[in-house]
Amino acid sequence: MPIGVPKVPFRSPGEEDAVWVDIYNRLHRERLLFLGQGVDSEISNQLVGLMVYLSMEDNTRDLYLFINSPGGWVIPGIAIYDAMQIVPPDVHTICMGLAASMGSFILVGGEFTKRLAFPHARVMIHQPASSFYEAQAGEFILEAEELLKLREILTRVYVQRTGKPLWVVSEDMERDVFMSATEAQAHGIVDLVAVENSADFV
């Protein structure tokens, strides 16, 4: 039987009594954000809205984005990435579990020196795929042209943010490339790998 979203007590400043709020609302108040599903327009809009709101509330405190995502749609993923670059606070990205496809693209978009992977996390990069497998010829050509443009955008970002040469990134994106946390660090996708029982990083 599903239990729904857990609720935790929260006391607003100046209030005597705590109220019960869902755990994600409580964590958002601490500037902790979560991408724990496939990337689509709904989660993209939620995360962008939260980043903008929290930036307006206090543009000096860092944001923390925890990622455990199999990837998803390219354009909503790019929207999250762009918002991370535009909001004034630094955005830490933390990979837990899996950051695949657009999940890894968002992971690499964290502030330099503030991208982290848990020790047993996995990262996967590849090129964007088409959704028009049964399209008419004309539609397929237009889709192919758009895919090439999107691939160029993603490749350019990976090159810029990993420091790897264009030919290395292009070759890696030809197929599904899975990496361990330490391999992702060597590849420049994350800067740090968390160690067990380390000091509190939040």
Swiss-Prot record:
PROSITE patterns recorded: CLP_PROTEASE_HIS (PS00382), CLP_PROTEASE_SER (PS00381)
Active-site residue list: S101, H126
Listed GO CC annotations: chloroplast stroma; endopeptidase Clp complex
This protein's UniProt keywords: Chloroplast, Hydrolase, Plastid, Protease, Serine protease
Catalytic activity: Hydrolysis of proteins to small peptides in the presence of ATP and magnesium. alpha-casein is the usual test substrate. In the absence of ATP, only oligopeptides shorter than five residues are hydrolyzed (such as succinyl-Leu-Tyr-|-NHMec, and Leu-Tyr-Leu-|-Tyr-Trp, in which cleavage of the -Tyr-|-Leu- and -Tyr-|-Trp bonds also occurs)
SUPFAM superfamilies: ClpP/crotonase
Record EC number: 3.4.21.92
Top-level taxon in the UniProt lineage: Eukaryota
Biological process (GO), any one: protein quality control for misfolded or incompletely synthesized proteins
Claim: Iron is one of the keywords in the record: no
Compartments where found: Plastid, Chloroplast stroma
InterPro entries named in the record: ClpP, ClpP/crotonase-like_dom_sf, ClpP/TepA, ClpP_His_AS, ClpP_Ser_AS
A GO term for molecular function: ATP-dependent peptidase activity
Presence of keyword RNA-binding: no
Function recorded in the entry: Cleaves peptides in various proteins in a process that requires ATP hydrolysis. Has a chymotrypsin-like activity. Plays a major role in the degradation of misfolded proteins.
Complexes and interactors: Component of the chloroplastic Clp protease core complex.
Similarity section: Belongs to the peptidase S14 family.
Protein name: ATP-dependent Clp protease proteolytic subunit
UniProt source species: Nuphar advena
